[in-house]
Amino acid sequence: MLGNPSLLRVFLQHRVVASFEHRALPEKSYATVVDIGAHTGQFSLLIRARYPEATIHAFEPLPEAAAKFRTVFEGDPRVLLHEAAIAPASGETTLYLDGAWDGGSLLPPVSAVREVPVRAAPLEEFLAADEIQSPALLKLDVQGYELEALHGCHSLLERFDDVVVELMLVEDRAGQPLASDLIALLRDEGFQLVGLDAFGRRNGRIARFDGIFSRLHSTS
């Protein structure tokens, strides 16, 4: 971050740090990046720094996080924020917060500190197929809702070359899919696991990581 003046400026002004833990992203010049679970812009900042020509479509349903995201990317015409969650069906749903407002999920925790009504819809309600220009990257980090979010992307998954998704080895929330579930779904959609990144530990053991998937027959 210290070597990138724009990222340092964002940190000093907004206290938002780019997701530098994602070190294994494919070496491609992405034209389109879809950031589902954008929060305050950590991953989108990394993308803007690494792929400055990419158009970023970010999705963040939590109003406080979306407001911060807008201030971080104010004036950037290549970053488009959609204040919504991606889900298989359209409608209003509940975002559960089990602590600080950076930990929201559409899956209910054991005890929710706060419940927020949010808009949810499939990706196709926000983007047309021709808006996803190749090479294209899809990123999902939605606190246990990744499987349902992928179902919400189903009609447009063929437009993506690569997918980055958080994978869990242990269940944090009731009904949360584990790594094997997501790997199987993406395999059925024509993607192969090609890399691991951003490891998280619990009690000294790896509990989660980001899986990097590439299409077996790239769209680019």
Indicate where each model-derived feature is located.
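Phosphate/nucleotide-binding beta-alpha loop and adjacent structural elements of enzyme active sites
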Residues: 1-220
